[in-house]
């Protein structure tokens, strides 16, 4: 039963067309899984995010943020409270050697804008399917580059709805980690300081990275991207491969035969299938090599109710 008081309060804070009730979240995840959100809102202004977060905090309503859903699994039980989609905060601005991008902008698009302005430093991001907000949240990286290498600052909102501007140092960016996660902040926009370069050289590097990605990753199936973090001194994919787990399937989800670090939805898989397969892989690798695999992918939402 949807809380009418919450709905009416949201209508005072954000235009009605930006509010959806009992919205299926599988529409917004790369895995094509997930239950419904009680309330799903799509703000287009920073002030709208602040207003909703402040209201939710004052009324003890849980808030969940969603970018483009590329490195997340949402359980079939859905998400209670308010889900805030940041995808409409997608502005990209160039000023001299800097780029300022909204949380919802695709980091791929930001890397392409940098190329178009002959700015180097974001080539590594040309194949990362996440949004700017998600990329800062987890210090996304690929092929030797990371967000922390070029970010200047991030404008965030805290749990009380207040704006906070954090410098590179204050963001505490580490391997797939940041102060954003620890303090339950949300990124509204981020600025990147780049360097002048040659467009042809930038394009050549992006072409090379794109070819490497397409040849090695199972892009033909829905997936949540890289499932596990890299254990110190090892590669998660190699450990999974050496455990003879490629092709292992639970329900409709299997460990990719193309890249063992990925799990793909090959036959109407569910979030429960993903979660069970993740646990099985972790258990098997631990038993075989004594190494813990920590998840890179986020798993959120409630478990489905048993019928």
Swiss-Prot record:
GO BP, one annotated term: cell wall organization
Catalytic activity, reaction form: UDP-N-acetyl-alpha-D-muramate + NADP(+) = UDP-N-acetyl-3-O-(1-carboxyvinyl)-alpha-D-glucosamine + NADPH + H(+)
Entry cofactors: FAD
Enzyme class, first EC level, given as a word: oxidoreductase
Keyword terms, alphabetized: Cell cycle, Cell division, Cell shape, Cell wall biogenesis/degradation, Cytoplasm, FAD, Flavoprotein, NADP, Oxidoreductase, Peptidoglycan synthesis
Record localization: Cytoplasm
Active site feature: 176, 226 (proton donor), 296
InterPro entries the UniProt entry points to: FAD-bd_PCMH, FAD-bd_PCMH-like_sf, FAD-bd_PCMH_sub1, FAD-bd_PCMH_sub2, MurB, MurB_C, MurB_C_sf, Oxid_FAD_bind_N
Pathway note: Cell wall biogenesis; peptidoglycan biosynthesis
Coiled-coil stretches: none
TM annotation in the entry: none
Any Pfam family matching the protein: MurB_C
One term of GO molecular function: UDP-N-acetylmuramate dehydrogenase activity
Entry's Gene Ontology cellular component terms: cytosol
UniProt KW Metal-binding keyword: no
Gene3D superfamilies on file: 3.30.465.10, UDP-N-acetylenolpyruvoylglucosamine reductase, C-terminal domain, Uridine Diphospho-n-acetylenolpyruvylglucosamine Reductase, domain 2
Entry-linked PROSITE patterns: FAD_PCMH
Top-level taxon in the UniProt lineage: Bacteria
Domain FAD-binding PCMH-type: 33-197
EC number: 1.3.1.98
PANTHER family linked to this entry: UDP-N-ACETYLENOLPYRUVOYLGLUCOSAMINE REDUCTASE
Known role: Cell wall formation.
Family: Belongs to the MurB family.
Name of the protein this chain belongs to: UDP-N-acetylenolpyruvoylglucosamine reductase
Phylogenetic placement of the source organism: Bacteria, Bacillati, Bacillota, Bacilli, Bacillales
Gene name, Swiss-Prot/TrEMBL: murB
């Amino acid at each position: 039963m949807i809380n009418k008081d919450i709905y009416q309060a949201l209508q005072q804070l954000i235009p009605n067309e930006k509010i959806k009730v009992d919205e299926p979240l599988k529409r917004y995840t790369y895995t094509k899984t997930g239950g419904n959100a009680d309330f799903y809102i799509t703000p287009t202004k920073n002030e709208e995010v602040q207003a909703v977060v402040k209201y939710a905090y004052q009324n003890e309503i849980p808030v969940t943020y969603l970018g483009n859903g590329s490195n997340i699994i949402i359980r079939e039980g859905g998400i209670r409270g308010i889900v805030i989609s940041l995808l409409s905060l997608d502005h990209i601005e160039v000023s001299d050697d800097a780029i300022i991008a909204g949380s919802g902008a695709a980091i791929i698009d930001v890397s392409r804008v940098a190329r178009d302005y002959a700015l180097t430093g974001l080539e590594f991001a040309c194949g990362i399917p996440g949004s700017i907000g998600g990329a800062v949240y987890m210090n996304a990286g690929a092929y030797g580059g990371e967000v922390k290498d070029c970010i200047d600052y991030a404008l965030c909102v805290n749990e009380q709805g207040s704006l906070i501007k954090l410098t590179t140092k204050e963001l505490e960016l580490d391997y797939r980690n940041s102060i954003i996660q620890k303090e339950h902040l949300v990124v509204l926009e981020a600025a990147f300081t780049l360097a002048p370069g040659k467009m042809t050289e930038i394009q050549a590097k992006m072409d090379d990275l794109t070819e490497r990605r397409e040849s090695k990753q199972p892009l033909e199936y829905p997936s949540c991207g890289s499932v596990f973090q890299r254990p110190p001194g090892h590669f998660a994919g190699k450990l999974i491969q050496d455990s003879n787990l490629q092709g292992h399937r639970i329900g409709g989800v299997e460990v990719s035969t193309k890249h063992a670090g990925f799990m793909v939805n090959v036959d109407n898989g569910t979030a429960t299938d993903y979660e069970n397969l993740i646990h099985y892989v972790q258990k098997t690798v631990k038993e075989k090599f004594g190494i813990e695999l920590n998840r890179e992918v986020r798993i959120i939402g409630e478990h489905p109710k048993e019928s």
